[in-house]
Amino acid sequence: MRVLPQHRDIVQKLRQLMRELAPDTREVLTYGILAWRANRIVAVLSPTKKDITLAFSRGASFEDKYGLLQGVGKVSKNLKLKDVKEIKKTVVAYYVKQALAADAK
């Protein structure tokens, strides 16, 4: 997975948080992008020129009390991160917990 230098710290932080918040998932490369799998793909991390996208496979069904989920898809929703300072553990944990619950169904 190719990541621009200005986004590497974001990727590193998200990988660290996923290891901590979703220890039973496996980090895998799928179609050249980083993903976390439990029963199915739970989340996908994809770099763009502008930001890093953390997409949740069933994010459209999530509660979104922070109003941060984006995307027009009927199933997947994502967080767009441009700076490591935007990453708040409690916020990521809120969405990851829902992703794991959706995967367990």
Feature annotation, model-predicted:
Residues 1-105:
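Charge-dense, helix-prone N-terminal extensions
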